[in-house]
């Protein structure tokens, strides 16, 4: 059976596959068996292995499940990576898209997060090529078109305020009032407020670097509008905005 270049898996299928290869925890993969009793797990796992065999993704002829080569490479990259990137991207003309990108020295694998037929979380695995090839695809996905640079110093507000502002958890006028009270130019603050209220594209970009399961996390947010791009990054107890 020919294996498609994009492999769709349910959360349970992805979880079982990582167990077959003896993988450690995969960033972005939620535990779909949470709440399942220990004595029920062998039956649940056997059922999922049967599904995977019917899809041609594993072979159980010798009683031990073995992944097909391409899928084995994907799962090993996802489960043994030192660097994982989590992206959420939304635009005015489309819904939110979410994915996790797993890096190895020779291959990068993307897992798009989708909704399965039953409404449960599903993962669509796809190779992005080498790290350099993958980076170009990531930048294209973010659609950061050239915009005029602003000749102003970065703005700053309390940590977490910007995400609350974007999600309307923070009163619409409160961040604006705060920034003006800090002495930032009204023209710059007004431009940022307009961007927050009507962005062309908004993305969150979080990198997890995990040697020995001790993760270092760095995140930025990217906001694109007609005349400018804005970059937001947590610095200490502040959101820094360029």
Task: Please provide the spans of the model-predicted regions.
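Short, amphipathic alpha-helical interface elements at domain boundaries
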Residues: 1-53, 57-76
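A general structural signal for short secondary-structure junctions and capping/turn motifs
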Residues: 6-7, 99-102, 222-223
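Exposed alpha-helical structural elements
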Residues: 12-16, 47, 70, 133-137, ...
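Residues that form generic nucleotide/phosphate-binding pockets
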Residues: 20, 74, 137-141, 195
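Accessory beta->alpha helical hairpin/"wing" motif in late/C-terminal subdomains of nucleic-acid enzymes
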Residues: 45, 55, 59-108, 112-135
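Surface-exposed beta-loop interaction hotspot
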Residues: 113-182
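Extended, charged low-complexity segments
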Residues: 197-242
């Amino acid at each position: 059976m020919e294996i498609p270049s994009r492999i769709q898996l349910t959360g349970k299928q992805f979880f079982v596959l990582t167990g077959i290869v003896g993988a450690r925890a995969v960033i972005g993969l939620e535990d779909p068996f949470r709440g399942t009793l220990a004595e029920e797990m062998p039956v649940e796992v056997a059922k999922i292995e049967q599904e995977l065999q019917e899809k041609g993704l594993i072979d159980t002829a010798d009683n031990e499940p073995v992944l097909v080569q391409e899928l084995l490479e994907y799962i090993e990259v996802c489960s043994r990576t030192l660097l994982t990137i989590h992206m959420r991207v939304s635009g005015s003309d489309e819904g939110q898209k979410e994915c996790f990108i797993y890096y190895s020295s020779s291959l990068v694998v993307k897992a798009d997060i989708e909704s399965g037929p039953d409404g449960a979380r599903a993962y669509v695995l796809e190779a992005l090529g080498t790290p350099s090839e993958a980076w170009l695809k990531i930048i294209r996905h973010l659609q950061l078109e050239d915009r005029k640079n602003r000749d102003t110093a970065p703005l700053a507000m309390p940590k977490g305020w910007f995400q609350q502002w974007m999600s309307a958890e923070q009163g619409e006028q409160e961040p604006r009032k705060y920034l003006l009270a800090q002495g930032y130019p009204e023209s710059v603050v007004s431009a940022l407020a307009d961007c927050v209220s009507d962005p062309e594209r908004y993305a969150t970009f979080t990198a997890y670097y995990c040697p020995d399961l001790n993760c270092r996390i760095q995140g930025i947010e990217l906001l694109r509008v007609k005349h400018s791009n804005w970059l937001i990054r947590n610095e200490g107890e502040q959101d820094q905005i360029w």
